[in-house]
């Protein structure tokens, strides 16, 4: 799993947030478009693309895209 690919999949969950504005350090909860529906879309994307099930608490605990990436990587190990 690579960060660039993860960010591309992550960006696909948003309608108006371009992928080039997202970095590993992006605090995704602060994005204008972020909502509970987007959070569910991200959880579903991670399950579909990586076969990893995230809980709501894990989504809440992740502050940045890097945090989310690290959580997924840990579950893949």
Language model features: what each stretch is:
Residues 1-43, 48-77:
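Phosphopantetheine-dependent thiolation modules in NRPS/PKS and related acyl-activating systems
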């Amino acid at each position: 799993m690579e960060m660039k690919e993860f960010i591309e999949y992550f960006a696909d969950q948003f309608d108006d947030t371009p992928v080039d504005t997202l970095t590993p350090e992006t605090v995704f909860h602060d994005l204008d478009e972020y909502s509970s529906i987007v959070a569910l879309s991200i959880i579903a994307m991670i399950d579909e693309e990586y076969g990893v099930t995230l809980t709501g608490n894990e989504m809440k605990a992740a502050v940045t895209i890097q945090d989310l990436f690290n959580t997924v990587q840990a579950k893949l190990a």
